[in-house]
């Protein structure tokens, strides 16, 4: 009898562990570097400015200058169904980005979701300033 109860318990435990598996944004090498005077980065000259770049990360990069003057960078790949690699787009004003596939929104200050169905923050990359050069790496 104890074996049957233990068997049922183990089966229930195994089934409870089965659920929708969350997809994650793959880790790919990112190594972007440009002078802050580069025309592509012009909108980063003041806090609240953001730019998008293609050809880096999974779906491109979004780089944002926070209200306190720091720089942050995220992969443009939305965390909602990341297997679709839907690239978020900058909103106007550029405090948020929107996933055009799901309608989810993310705050650029820290990458957190602000509109469903997003539950996970955007994938963040490291940003370094060396002299007049901005570098984004992972």
Residue ranges and their predicted role:
Residues 106-114:
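Short metal-binding segments enriched for Cys and/or His
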Residues 1-18:
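Sec-dependent bacterial lipoprotein signal peptides
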Residues 12-15, 47, 96-97:
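Short hydrophobic/aromatic-rich motifs at helix boundaries and adjacent loops
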Residues 69, 101-102:
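Short loop/turn microsegments at loop-to-beta-strand junctions
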Residues 92-101, 113-123:
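Short cysteine/histidine-rich metal-coordination sites, predominantly Zn2+-binding motifs
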């Amino acid at each position: 009898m104890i074996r049957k109860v233990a068997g049922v318990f183990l089966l229930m435990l195994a089934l409870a562990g089965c659920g929708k598996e969350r997809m994650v944004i793959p880790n790919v090498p990112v190594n972007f570097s440009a002078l802050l005077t580069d025309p592509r980065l012009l909108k980063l000259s003041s806090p609240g400015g953001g730019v998008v770049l293609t050809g880096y990360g999974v779906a491109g990069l979004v780089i944002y200058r926070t209200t306190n003057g720091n720089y942050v960078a995220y992969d443009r790949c939305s965390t909602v169904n990341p297997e679709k690699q839907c690239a978020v787009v900058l909103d106007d004003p550029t405090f948020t980005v929107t996933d055009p596939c799901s309608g989810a929104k993310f705050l650029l200050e820290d990458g957190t979701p602000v509109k469903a169905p997003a539950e996970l923050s955007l994938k963040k990359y490291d940003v370094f300033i060396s002299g007049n050069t901005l570098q984004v790496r992972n």
